[in-house]
From Swiss-Prot:
GO molecular function, one term: triose-phosphate isomerase activity
Family the entry assigns: Belongs to the triosephosphate isomerase family.
Lineage: Eukaryota, Fungi, Dikarya, Ascomycota, Saccharomycotina
Name of the protein described by the UniProt record: Triosephosphate isomerase
Subunit text: Homodimer.
Active site: 95 (electrophile), 165 (proton acceptor)
NCBIfam families cross-referenced by the UniProt entry: tim
Underlying gene: TPI1
Gene Ontology BP, a term: canonical glycolysis
Coiled-coil ranges (or none): none
Highest taxon in the source lineage: Eukaryota
Record keywords: Gluconeogenesis, Glycolysis, Isomerase
Length: 248
């Protein structure tokens, strides 16, 4: 089946009011394809700015993280309700930097994913293996474990987009070959068909998220199970538009 092409832009902990406004303005001025879904994730202080200044109907705004409680004594956290109150409609969960630096567990990420969905947000669920895990040839075991944690608590995956990000390729300039990505994405979809059902797995978009840029994005064009990209550093640059247009 044809799944709508999806491009996510994760700004990470980068930007100021001025630079985020400039990025959004650049997207507003671009002629973007109407059949590509785009989601940008600025730092939390600039979510409302991005929402208010975005003029593109095909672009929505996401948080980079959320908590699994509605409110309370959770210093520094942000709830789905607060994210929605700022006008955003998405959140990321499970980004490798949260897993490796902040030490978030599979179960905690699953809990956050479920709570975000229950509160009406859509979710970009990030999964992927480290370089050590790749060398140990356990890529699919790791991805399956991370997905299964969510599948145990979430039955409806219609508002989840999965992003496969090989941790060894993030911010390193190293990228999996399109063939590598397709092979892994196909295996992820096959695993999902067992855990959430064949129909849901077929409909779930799986993004590639490892050092994607304007130059290498078109190389993934004919890969059947690569349904888009989760872009990091390149989303801060004009080439983000080239990535959005890479399926034209």
């Amino acid at each position: 089946m044809a799944r709508q092409f999806f491009v996510g832009g994760n700004f990470k902990m980068n930007g100021t009011r001025e630079s985020v406004s400039k990025i959004v303005d650049g997207l507003n001025k671009a002629e973007l394809p109407s059949n590509v879904e785009v989601v940008i994730a600025p730092p939390a202080p600039y979510i409302a700015l991005a929402v208010n200044e975005n003029k593109q109907k095909t672009i929505e705004v996401s948080a980079q993280n959320c908590f699994d409680k509605a409110s309370g004594a959770y210093t520094g956290e942000i709830s789905p309700e607060q994210i929605k109150d700022l006008g955003a409609t998405w959140t990321l969960t499970g980004h490798s930097e949260r897993r490796t630096i902040i030490k978030e567990s599979d179960d905690f990420i699953a809990s956050k994913t479920k709570f975000a969905l229950d509160q009406g947000l859509s979710v970009i669920l990030c999964i992927g293996e480290t370089l050590e895990e790749r060398k140990a040839n356990v890529t699919l075991d790791v991805c399956a474990r991370q997905l299964d944690a969510v599948a145990r608590v979430v039955s409806d995956w219609s508002k989840i987009v999965v992003a496969y990000e090989p941790v060894w390729a993030i911010g390193t300039g190293l990228a999996a070959t399109p063939e590598d990505a397709q092979e892994t994405h196909k295996a992820i979809r096959e695993h999902l068909s067992k855990s959430i059902g064949a129909d849901a797995a077929e409909k779930t978009r799986i993004l590639y998220g490892g050092s994607v840029n304007g130059k290498n994005a078109p190389e993934f064009k004919d890969k059947a199970d690569v349904d888009g990209f989760l872009v990091g550093g390149a989303s801060l640059k004009p080439e983000f538009v080239d990535i959005i247009k890479s399926r034209l």
